[in-house]
Amino acid sequence: MADLLLECLIQKMFCLISFKEASKMSILSKSWLQAWSTLPNLEFFVNCWQGWVAHINIVDTIMERYGKGKIPIEKFELSVFFADSTQLFPLIDKWLLVALQNGVKELILHFTSYPAPILTILAEKSLRELVLHDCTLMPVSLSSGVVSCNSLRKISLSYVTLDENMLQTLFYSCPFIVSFLLEYCSGLTMKHIKIKSDSLKVLKIHQYCGIWEIEAPDLVSLDYTGNEIPVLNIARESSQ
């Protein structure tokens, strides 16, 4: 019990410092190494500089260990800046699956043109926050067997490619979403785009397309940048 408590305390301390600093401190003792080896927060940044193959192999080794050991993952952040990113897609799919299977709560992906498997992501029942940057969301219609992600509370999409059906799918699949950010995304071509959510409290839209209609009776914060003033409906209908 004492060893487990010590490991938990060390892990909490590791979460307060950078990944690089935590790796250096892992050599202090077996307890520190064990805590380092089971960190719940994983953050990986891969650049297309010399030695990138070794970096990819390190990430792959770590994710295989987490997968085989079923080590819980609370946060998984992956940022890849690579010229020919498509060759890494199979690896990204594999790492993402490990994170989802291990109960990830916060998922952050920054990867140019990566076709994020959104239905697989939304099927994860423990996910609370989803942040996508530069990714592509596969076209999905409401008739495609969309799952409900009742745990998801926050979605942030920046420079993501998606269409109107995907936007509606996200709100339809996440009935308890509280915060939503849509920033300079492409693919939204309809002249009239509507956002409807009974749970949404914080909404940020930085887009220069479409005439927005926002129906969110619980909305308390709106940050909007666009060509048209949105139509707001924030009055809750009377039950009488």
Regions flagged by a language model, labelled:
Residues S197, L203-Q240:
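Acidic, glycine-rich loop-and-beta core segments that form the ion-binding/anion-interacting portion
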